[in-house]
């Protein structure tokens, strides 16, 4: 066969093999185009896993009418003009291949309008011929790209597509990756008409943390350390997880270079070395890192899908990242976050929130599957590793061993924070538990077989009624005990103790108040302090920071509770009664849980306050029913 130049149509389809691997590849290219156009609101609509329809709508700058046809041509772009631009790329796209490649294997419709235009225009291209048709359309400022029937003219490619669920899970991963670096952009992802993801803009640090938690999980945020590290033109920021939050698979490793997610061996090696003395070789660190540097110092044009980069000074980048992460791990006690009240309101009161994953796809971490963009580690386990002491050390040289962070010797942070967070009862309180109450707690494991358990007040628990009440027996008498009222009594008794156990908040809560709310705070500050709350007051800024809470209330929505107390009617019930009325009662689905609550309440009872408990017992008269038998 003689050598000849390929037709543009065939060349585009060959190029599409690199750019358009699956529907997720199309979504990635089109969303990156929207971001390059300055969009801060992007909606992604998917049908049947992307095989039938992919629609990307944005509010970017739009494309002028005279450039619409050119936008679908190969090697046509507005992002670079000469070699100097290519050597200093900051945009996500720059080759001008995506739209041409996508349109060659699908039916593509592009509708756009610029701010200067009075009407929008639409261009349509289909398949191999790639002939375009332009006509007027109705559309706001911005662009909408619809990709229908992907691979309709390449059956061999289409048959390799997986199930709709699998293909959509790859699209979902792409959106999560992009949303993790573009905090100022709102993303909405739908599948077959149902909203699956909805990320609102996140400018403040607390809002960014909320998005990170929605993508990486709450446990990652609870164990993450904020990192800020600078040297000349290099800037490293983001979050690294403490070593005790290590992973068995490399599924929570995200790294971005100038806003672009990449895989790079230099970065992977630096991160691995920073954790080397804390993690075994079969464990992986969790991190979300953003590296900003001079675009002239990195080449992003080395991979067909731009997933890999090449640094001009690899050793400098390696040492910079290693030192930054090592410094963050070594100074865990000095890193703190403040959560804004506006970002942590009660879920029912939020008009916009991060939605939970739809049942039809795999939820977020840790069951969302392998992160294909996480750095790949291939280090083999090392034999005869040297022993390391329990004292954290960060030598300048590279260590070949590791210290197991899960060993018996706790780190400084574990001693100061985690041990305090996990403590639930003070030693004195545990000593006060009566022998009978202790027996009740141990007996709860035998409820199913015994059905009747004796409590310390000589009451026998017979049954849990509709998850709301306990049916109790004392001699020949029967009583109903409301579990909701019992919980509120238990809270009041716990908060009346002479020594109240406190729990430190890993992430302090910041309240920004109005003048009237701050005046109410000054009135009730002693009451809050008396029951175990610890605030830091900033009168000039009308701001409160909540650092510690009573352990009995550690699972409550304290943001809502505190704000409700600062706006309550002064002439209503007492402070403690009003506070307990704001707390959310637990739902009891098992008799064992209800008996634990009863035992804990009885432990707090004394001769002076036992009357409050007996008043909750409502007698049950069986005689009328027995007479009818």
UniProtKB/Swiss-Prot annotation:
One of its GO terms (biological process) is mismatch repair. Keywords: DNA damage, DNA repair. Pfam families: DNA_mis_repair (PF01119), HATPase_c_3 (PF13589), MutL_C (PF08676). GO terms for molecular function: ATP binding; ATP hydrolysis activity; ATP-dependent DNA damage sensor activity; mismatched DNA binding. Signal peptide: none annotated. InterPro entries: DNA_mismatch_repair_CS, DNA_mismatch_repair_MutL, DNA_mismatch_S5_2-like, HATPase_C_sf, MutL/Mlh/PMS, MutL/Mlh/Pms-like, MutL_C, MutL_C_dimsub. This is DNA mismatch repair protein MutL. GO terms for cellular component: mismatch repair complex. It comes from Haemophilus influenzae (strain ATCC 51907 / DSM 11121 / KW20 / Rd). It comes from the Bacteria. The lineage of its organism: Bacteria, Pseudomonadati, Pseudomonadota, Gammaproteobacteria, Pasteurellales. CDD domains: HATPase_MutL-MLH-PMS-like, MutL_Trans_MutL. This protein is involved in the repair of mismatches in DNA. It is required for dam-dependent methyl-directed DNA mismatch repair. May act as a 'molecular matchmaker', a protein that promotes the formation of a stable complex between two or more DNA-binding proteins in an ATP-dependent manner without itself being part of a final effector complex. The gene is mutL. Belongs to the DNA mismatch repair MutL/HexB family. The keyword DNA repair applies.
